[in-house]
Amino acid sequence: QAAARQLQLPQPQIVVTQYAGQAREAARQYAASGTPVALYACGGDGTLNELVQGAAGSANVAVGCVPCGSGNDYVRNFGAAGQAPFLDFAAQLQAQPCRVDLLQTSLGIGIDICAAGLDAQVAYGIPKFRRLPGCGGTAAYTLSILQAMLSRFGHKLRVAIDGKENTGTYMMAAICNGGYYGGGYQAAPYAAMDDGLLDIVLVKPISRIQVAGILAKYKAGRHMQDADTIVPEFRSFMTLYRARSVEMQVLDNRPIIATIDGECAPVMELKAEVLPSALNVLLPRPACGSAVIRGLYECPMQAKAK
């Protein structure tokens, strides 16, 4: 409110949500009204996801994010400045909307990453660790990884990428519109949110010792040599595709855990496709990098891909 007064803008309305899904309902109501409005999610990726679901496809609603949750992976997609530009309310109120792609999945709509297998199993276990004192985003994620590594992982899957099928056993899959999940793990360091494509990372089963050995590199995005090349250490078990859609079917009668932007469920089938230019987002200018998103903003993810 102070930033709005300083900029001589109308005072924003502040709504404290009282139940899960309330932000989604509000965004849908604004979208249906046709009135131009900027909606800011003040929370974590779950709160943002509610606004995204409610505003998807609308021309009159723009969605911004003030990161104050435990993971805050969405804002990591926009450069080395990190959260700081998104916590600058003056910059937020002066942001102009630009269009980004979304993920349409059988679990719902999301903006960042849909995952299945070990990494989704990790996300499934995070809430109980977050209840522990001093156990925030990355710490809870790491503890959940350790728990998941002690369980059985790997599923026989039929995978169709843009209609081309293959069958194999996979430990995990990450279907990426953005690059980050799990409190800073960089699954797709060259993913761009406005290129009309998904970066799909498939990982075959490896030993628990191997998982422990590569985890830090995977978190830092060092499994990718460049936009199209996996580093030699990962090539025997990891494959990257860029596509518009992917379908997965479990063939071993054991449900696989899947997640979209942190929301988890056991499934026997998973479908995902890109929704090009499906959402107006608000990016504060200090969050910009060196390649243009729709001619308005700079995105370091695209700069890497050049």
Q: Where do the language-model regions lie?
A:
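Short Gly/Thr/Asp-enriched flexible loops that form oxyanion-binding sites at enzyme active sites
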Residues: T47-S58
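Gly/Ser/Thr-rich active-site loops/lids in small-molecule metabolic enzymes
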Residues: R130-A140, G184, P189-A212
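Short glycine-/acidic-enriched loop or helix-start segments at secondary-structure transitions
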Residues: E50-V52, V75-R76, G184-Y185, A212
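ATP/nucleoside-binding phosphotransfer catalytic cores, i.e., glycine-rich phosphate-binding loops
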Residues: I161, T167, A192, L202-K306
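Catalytic core of DAGKc-family lipid kinases
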Residues: T17, G57-I175
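Short conserved active-site loop signatures built around small residues
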Residues: A23, D45, A173
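Glycine-rich phosphate/pyrophosphate-binding beta-alpha loops
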Residues: A115, D119, A174-P189, C264
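ATP/NTP phosphate-donor binding region
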Residues: Q1-L39, N49, L87, C288, ...
